[in-house]
Amino acid sequence: MPSISININLAFAVALLGMLMFRSHMMSSLLCLEGMMLSMFILSTLIILNLQFTMSFIMPILLLVFAACEAAIGLALLVMVSNNYGLDYIQNLNLLQC
């Protein structure tokens, strides 16, 4: 079990590093964010199953619901930005730029 949790924590760290490195494009940021949410889901499910917290088994499902909402809003924002500007740069979202 410890090797599995280390691998999942490493996957979260790699997704976070990808989010920090490739933050200029919206599509890569959304993919890294989904990787982070998936690793958080798997880690929370493993912790709940190993510690036998049967009353809190709704937590991973709730995390999946929020991840699905985040993905839908992110993809809608990506389509809107790419239709308006033709690019998926995050800097296009700043309306205060000249």
Swiss-Prot record:
CC terms in the record's Gene Ontology section: mitochondrial inner membrane; respiratory chain complex I
Subcellular location: Mitochondrion inner membrane
Family under the similarity heading: Belongs to the complex I subunit 4L family.
Gene: MT-ND4L
PANTHER family xrefs: NADH-UBIQUINONE OXIDOREDUCTASE CHAIN 4L (PTHR11434:SF0), NADH-UBIQUINONE OXIDOREDUCTASE SUBUNIT ND4L (PTHR11434)
Pfam families in the record: Oxidored_q2
Keyword Transport: yes
EC number: 7.1.1.2
Gene Ontology process terms (BP): ATP synthesis coupled electron transport
Entry membrane topology: Multi-pass membrane protein
GO molecular function: NADH dehydrogenase (ubiquinone) activity
Transmembrane segments: 2-22, 29-49, 61-81
Coiled coil: none
Organism ancestry: Eukaryota, Metazoa, Chordata, Craniata, Vertebrata
Signal peptide range in chain numbering: none
UniProtKB keywords: Electron transport, Membrane, Mitochondrion, Mitochondrion inner membrane, NAD, Respiratory chain, Translocase, Transmembrane, Transmembrane helix, Transport, Ubiquinone
Name the record gives this protein: NADH-ubiquinone oxidoreductase chain 4L
Enzyme class: translocase
Subunit architecture: Core subunit of respiratory chain NADH dehydrogenase (Complex I) which is composed of 45 different subunits.
